[in-house]
Amino acid sequence: MYKAVIFDFFGVFCPDITLEWFKKTVQEYESKLADFQEICTRSDYGKLSRADFNKEVAALAGVSVGDLIAGVESETVINNSLVAYCKKLRAEGCAITCVSNGTHEWTLQVINDHGLGRLFDLVVLSGDLGIVKPNPEIYKYTLKKLGIKPSEAVFVDDREVNT
């Protein structure tokens, strides 16, 4: 058995909620996708606060910040089967860890708003470190914090490029 299972959050525990909202809300979103991704990249590197992220994405989408927040919250559906499985793994002594690209304030808000704060033994966020997956340094940092070797953990992500 592994000593730790390391999960991405968005796309694994719940959809990539802001992207899903953007696709549903913005007409001809493909023409604005590169700009959206550039905003997300700055946020993932910790160079953009969540408030500024919301302002920029709302402006790009042509909606109010309030509509953006409400829309994104409506996209947040937690994978409860995965949560139950993680609780089982923790009960068996396996550390449950989150490594995700995103800001501290936003990711922890989603985690805590959905009662998942105690699920994770460790949460590592790209915005805190300025290191974005798939950069190996974010995984090395996580393993060091856990005090384990790479062979003692498995990583689960919705994007193959990150594994």
Q: Language-model segments: which ranges?
A:
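Active-site neighborhood of HAD-like aspartate-dependent phosphohydrolases
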Residues: 1-41, 45, 51, 55-63
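Generic structural signal for small/hydrophobic residues in well-ordered secondary structure
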Residues: 8-11, 46, 89, 98, ...
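Conserved Lys-Pro-Asp/Glu-containing loop-to-beta segment of HAD-superfamily phosphomonoesterases
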Residues: 132-160
